């Protein structure tokens, strides 16, 4: 932003703005220093969809299947650093499963 720091400028930023601060060393701003959060005005739901050929009907069944088949499942997202990508990586980390991330350049999320 090029506005003077007068307290009258409001910017709406998405999650990737905060995520990028952890992914990239050199940005033209410092997210922690330059931006002061005021309110969370939206929640971004995450939905997990699985191909019907995967024999899992619940999340625990999916986790068990993924652990039994490490690296054989793919996880798609709109792109590196997007909210679905980061939440997918968090899901992998929290469950101890191994899936291959497939980033698509289909849009921003």
Task: Give names to the regions the model predicted.
Residues 12-17, 107:
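Beta->alpha turn/N-cap motifs
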Residues 2-8, 22-106:
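Hinge/capping helix and adjacent helix->loop/strand transition within the periplasmic-binding protein
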